[in-house]
From Swiss-Prot:
UniProt GO cellular component terms: cytoplasm; nucleus
Stated family: Belongs to the eIF-2B alpha/beta/delta subunits family. MtnA subfamily.
Organism of this sequence: Leishmania infantum
Record InterPro entries: IF-2B-related, IF-M1Pi, IF_2B-like_C, Initiation_fac_2B_a/b/d, M1Pi_N, NagB/RpiA_transferase-like
Site feature: Transition state stabilizer: C177
Main location: cytoplasm
Pathway linked to the protein: Amino-acid biosynthesis; L-methionine biosynthesis via salvage pathway; L-methionine from S-methyl-5-thio-alpha-D-ribose 1-phosphate: step 1/6
One term of GO molecular function: S-methyl-5-thioribose-1-phosphate isomerase activity
Catalytic activity line of the entry: 5-(methylsulfanyl)-alpha-D-ribose 1-phosphate = 5-(methylsulfanyl)-D-ribulose 1-phosphate
Protein name, per record: Methylthioribose-1-phosphate isomerase
Coiled-coil parts of chain: none
C-alpha cells in the first residue's frame, strides 16, 4: 500500500492572489532571497536568468506570474475591458514561452491556458475575465502538487518492490541536478521519490551529483536533504561510474524537461552519462516526471532544441564572479544545458503521477501517447 506523502518544509513559490514571490535559487545556499514578480517582464526574466528553474516550477511560476501581472493591470486601470484582459493574457503567454526553449512543461502549460482563456466571454467586465484567468492559473499549481504526490508514491513503491524481490529492505539512489521542492510546486519528481522512501524509513542513502556548471545538485539538492535530515552523499559528476562499480546503488532516478514519444528524454547535462554507466553496471534508471512533461508530438530526441548558455557559466566562479579559466584566442567553450538520453537506456521505467511505465523488450521502448491517454 502506498504511503501518504508528508508535508515538505521548503517553498520556492510563494503565492497569494495578486502576489507572487519567487526564491532566487542562484543565491542558495548562501542567501535566501525572494523576488517579487509584478510584471510579465519580471516572470520572463526570472525564468530566463534561472532564478526559478526546474521544468514544473517554471510552468507553475509562468502561469501565476502572468495571472498576477494581469490582475495588476486591471487594478491600475490599464486594462479596461474583458477583451483587453483576454488579449493581454494571451499575448503574455506567447511572450513568456520565449524565455527558455527546452522544457516542454512551459509550452504545454501556457498553450493549455491559452486554449481555456480563448473560451472566456470577452464581453464580460475586465475584473470578471481577470478573475477567471487567475483561477485557471491557480489550477496549474494545484494540479502540480497532486502530480508530485502521485509520482513520489508510485516511484517509491515500485523501486522498493523491486528491491524486496532481491532481498533488500532499504535502497540507495543516485540522482542528478535538483528535482525536489525547489524545482516543483512542493515535493519534487525524482527527489520526491527519494523523499517518500525516506519518509517510509526505506532510504539507505541518496547520492547527489554536483551537476556542473550551475551545481544544482551541490547547492540545491544537498540543501533540501540537509533541511529535512535526508541521508545524502555529494559526489563529483565524474565519480558516478566509480560509485556504481564500488557501492550498491539500487536505482538511478532522474527528472526530465521533455520526454519524447519514443521515450527519448531531455534532462540536465550529464544525465546521458549516468544512463550509459547505469546500463553497463546493471543499475536500473528511472525518469520521474509529471504527465505535463510528456511530449507525444515530438517523435524523438533529435528533434529537441537543446539550450546552450553563456561560456562564462563554465569559466567564471559563480560566487566570486572571477574568471578561473585561462583565456586565449584558440579557446572555445561549449555549454549545453541539457542532453538526450535514448529511451533504450531508461531501463527501469518512466514514473508519472499515473504509475510506472516499464520499457518494452524492443524498440520503440516507450509509447508516450499511451501514457498520456491513461486516466
Amino acid at each position: 500500500m502506498m504511503s501518504k506523502p508528508h508535508h515538505a518544509t521548503l517553498e520556492s513559490i510563494k503565492y497569494t492572489p495578486g502576489s507572487l514571490r519567487l526564491l532566487d535559487q542562484r543565491k542558495l545556499p548562501l542567501e535566501t532571497v525572494f523576488d517579487d514578480v509584478l510584471t510579465v517582464e519580471d516572470i520572463w526574466s526570472a525564468i530566463n536568468e534561472m532564478r526559478v528553474r526546474g521544468a514544473p516550477a517554471i510552468a507553475v511560476s509562468a502561469a501565476l506570474g502572468i495571472a498576477v501581472a494581469t490582475q495588476r493591470k486591471v487594478a491600475n486601470g490599464e486594462l479596461k475591458s474583458g477583451s483587453e484582459v483576454q488579449a493581454f493574457f494571451l499575448s503574455s503567454c506567447d511572450f513568456v514561452m520565449t524565455s527558455r526553449p527546452t522544457a516542454v512543461n512551459l509550452f504545454n502549460c501556457l498553450r493549455d491556458l491559452k486554449e481555456q482563456v480563448e473560451k472566456l466571454d470577452p464581453t464580460k467586465a475586465a475584473a470578471e475575465v481577470a478573475q477567471a484567468c487567475v483561477e485557471l492559473a491557480e489550477a496549474v499549481y494545484t494540479k502540480d502538487v497532486a502530480f508530485n504526490e502521485g509520482i513520489m508514491r508510485h516511484g517509491a513503491a515500485h523501486i522498493l518492490a523491486v528491491a524486496k524481490a532481491e532481498g533488500r529492505d532499504k535502497v540507495s539512489i543516485l540522482t542528478i541536478c535538483n528535482t525536489g521542492a525547489l524545482a516543483t510546486s512542493r515535493y519534487g519528481t525524482a527527489l520526491g521519490v527519494v523523499r517518500q522512501l525516506f519518509y517510509d524509513g526505506k532510504l539507505e542513502r541518496v547520492y547527489a551529483c554536483e551537476t556542473r556548471p550551475w551545481n544544482q545538485g551541490a547547492r540545491l539538492t544537498v540543501y533540501e536533504c540537509v533541511q529535512e535530515g535526508i541521508p545524502c552523499t555529494l559526489i563529483c559528476d565524474g565519480a558516478a561510474s566509480s560509485l556504481m562499480l564500488n557501492r550498491k546503488i539500487d536505482a538511478v532516478v532522474v527528472g526530465a524537461d521533455r520526454i519524447c514519444q519514443n521515450g527519448d528524454t531531455a534532462n540536465k547535462i550529464g544525465t546521458y552519462n549516468l544512463a550509459v554507466s547505469a546500463k553497463f553496471h546493471g543499475v536500473k534508471l528511472y525518469v520521474a516526471a509529471p504527465s505535463t512533461t510528456l511530449d507525444a508530438k515530438t517523435a524523438s530526441g533529435n528533434r529537441v532544441e537543446i539550450e546552450e548558455r553563456e561560456p562564462t557559466e563554465i569559466t567564471t566562479n559563480m560566487v566570486t564572479k572571477q574568471r578561473v579559466v585561462a583565456d586565449g584566442p584558440h579557446l572555445s567553450v561549449w555549454n549545453p544545458v541539457f542532453d538526450i538520453t535514448p529511451g533504450e537506456l531508461i531501463t527501469g521505467g518512466i514514473i508519472t503521477e499515473k504509475g510506472v511505465q516499464a520499457p518494452t523488450a524492443s524498440a520503440p521502448y516507450y509509447d508516450i501517447a499511451s501514457i498520456i491517454a491513461q486516466p
